[in-house]
């Protein structure tokens, strides 16, 4: 069945290419230009200080990996389970999802991350109907075959991923990052693509866009998600203009930045990549492709930023969190990576193009993910040791009883062996079957519930609650 579906997809893609060739002959070359990012106005060229409406004593961040609709469904299941996790914090009933202050997404994970940031908890159930249960991929192909779009594709400034962005714009209702900022109690949204020239992550954040002197508020969610989902060869890169020469020279004078210049190599590399964006003459444009090529977990840039900022304490203190405030820091990393479709080591035949792309994305990519996960484990131990040792200063943002909970949620940890093997072979596509959606949503909730780290968090929340929390907090069997 999988071969049949893949063959059908390739046939449709070939039909699209053939139709495009006819359009080229009939229409010549189109001059249409797609949306392009805007520069920051002169009066608004400083990074805004974000004021969260959530209780800063508990900070929750969620990262959703790439993997097409498979990752979106698995991540949706995790978010749904987080909403089911109810507890009382500082005398007020809440849920783990409502306490989430940061959501980060890559590729397929960015589709659901952006939807949640835009529509919140009340709008999240609609995502299942509007994306997961729809044949999004077929509608994308149908849209690509429309004569107007075929002619647009003859433009040297417009590629296949722009058609994906148009379809995603319908899903998000034309919303921009500025619209997300105006929604009450919105989480910070991080979407990661890959800078083709650097091979590193490019985040759609205020910090990143300030480097190129561009206004993130005007960026459509659809553009960011399409950039993060632009698988090389199958889809085209997306382009941003660098306006760094229109902003005052950005100088970093903090002691943390000075330490980063001579400290950990990851911090030095992070700062060097930052600096490369400030030269608009050498780098007037940035071309973006699938974020999974640089960081399929969507967590590496968060860690590198903390290192470059001088460490966890310094990073949080610089965003204005008062001393001795943070009691719980929770990071949930969701990984929906699958196995390669074919084990190329089992044959002496030359792998075909589909197998090569598959192996590069899910073989090499899996190795990079394992390295990131190991780095996360190491840095988590360092954070725990730092908390245990305490801070001699009176400006420490962590309370004396502060705890850090890092919770990995991997599709490979699905409890049922048969279901796990089947789900790990679900293709990376914009649409999967309704049965696969149901199983992946259930798997997301199940893996989170059975996670030892999650159970430890639940128990900790029970112990720190001022009075008995609602029954929904109890860890489910």
Task: Label each region the model flagged.
Residues 2-12, 28-477:
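Catalytic domains of lipid- and phosphate-ester/thioester hydrolases
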Residues 16-27:
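Bacterial N-terminal signal peptides
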């Amino acid at each position: 069945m999988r071969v049949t579906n893949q063959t059908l997809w390739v046939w449709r893609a070939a039909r699209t290419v053939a139709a495009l060739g006819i359009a080229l002959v009939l229409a010549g070359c189109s001059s249409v230009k797609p949306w392009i990012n805007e520069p920051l106005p002169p009066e608004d060229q400083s990074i805004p200080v974000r004021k969260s409406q959530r209780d800063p004593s508990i900070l929750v961040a969620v990262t959703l990996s790439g993997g097409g609709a498979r990752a979106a469904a698995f991540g949706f299941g995790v978010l749904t389970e987080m909403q089911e996790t109810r507890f009382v914090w500082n005398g007020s009933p809440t849920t783990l999802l409502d306490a989430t202050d940061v959501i980060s997404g890559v590729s397929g994970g960015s589709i659901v991350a952006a939807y949640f940031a835009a529509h919140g908890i009340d709008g999240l159930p609609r995502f299942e109907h509007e994306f997961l249960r729809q044949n999004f991929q077929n509608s994308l192909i149908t849209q690509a075959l429309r004569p107007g779009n075929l002619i647009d594709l003859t433009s040297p400034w417009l590629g296949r991923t722009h058609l994906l962005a148009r379809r995603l714009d319908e899903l998000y209702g034309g919303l921009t990052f500025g619209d997300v900022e105006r929604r009450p109690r919105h989480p910070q949204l991080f979407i990661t693509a890959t800078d083709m020239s650097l091979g590193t992550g490019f985040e759609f954040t205020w910090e990143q866009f300030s480097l190129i002197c561009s206004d993130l508020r005007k960026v459509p969610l659809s553009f960011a998600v399409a950039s993060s989902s632009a698988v090389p060869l199958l889809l085209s890169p997306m382009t941003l203009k660098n306006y760094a020469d229109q902003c005052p020279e950005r100088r970093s004078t903090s002691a943390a930045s000075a330490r980063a210049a001579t400290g950990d190599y990851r911090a030095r590399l992070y700062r060097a990549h930052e600096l490369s964006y400030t030269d608009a003459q050498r780098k007037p444009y940035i071309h973006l492709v699938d974020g999974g090529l640089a960081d399929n977990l969507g967590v590496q840039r968060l860690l590198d930023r903390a290192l470059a900022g001088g460490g966890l304490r310094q990073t949080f203190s610089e965003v204005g969190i008062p001393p001795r405030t943070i009691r719980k820091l929770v990071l949930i990393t969701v990984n929906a990576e699958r196995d390669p479709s074919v084990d190329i080591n089992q044959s002496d035949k030359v792998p075909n193009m589909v197998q090569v792309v598959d192996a590069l994305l899910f073989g090499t990519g899996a190795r990079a993910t394992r390295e990131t996960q190991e780095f996360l484990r190491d840095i988590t131990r360092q954070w725990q040791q730092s908390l245990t040792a305490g801070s001699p200063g009176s400006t420490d943002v962590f309370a004396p009883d502060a705890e850090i909970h890092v919770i990995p949620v991997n599709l490979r940890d699905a409890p049922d062996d048969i279901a796990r093997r089947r789900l790990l072979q679900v293709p990376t596509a914009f649409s999967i079957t309704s049965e696969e959606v149901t199983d992946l949503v259930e798997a997301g909730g199940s893996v989170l519930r059975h996670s030892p780290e999650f159970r430890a968090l639940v128990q900790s929340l029970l112990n720190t609650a001022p009075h008995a929390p609602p029954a929904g907090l109890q860890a489910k069997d």
